[in-house]
């Protein structure tokens, strides 16, 4: 089993803690709620042994990554921007992205918005629902007020 390396990188205006292992094509593992990189501790060495450079960040507001105070700093655009910046900080141009639970929408949106970077996407433990009559943002406003 390979030893995990921990470090902090600057991305999208925040300091992001990452755990990483291995060499090869980049695979990014986005944790769920309320978790951290540690959720991927068993997958990191296995993927590294399989020939990948695997990275599990603490996402914005979790673990040892910065937690901006403003609620508006936690949009999908910010979260995906953090991951795009992570790819850049690692001097890579493409990556596979996998999300678990709350990390799945980050993975989906990263692949949707930046297909030039994210060439494959995986989502675990999250339901996919049929498109509703109302946009999800409108439903959230109704359920959570302003």
Can you name each region flagged by the protein language model?
Residues 11-13, 21-22, 116:
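A generic fold-level signal
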Residues 17-66:
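Conserved HGGG/HGGXW glycine-rich cap/lid loop of the alpha/beta-hydrolase fold
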Residues 5-11:
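Short acidic-hydrophobic surface loop/beta-edge motif
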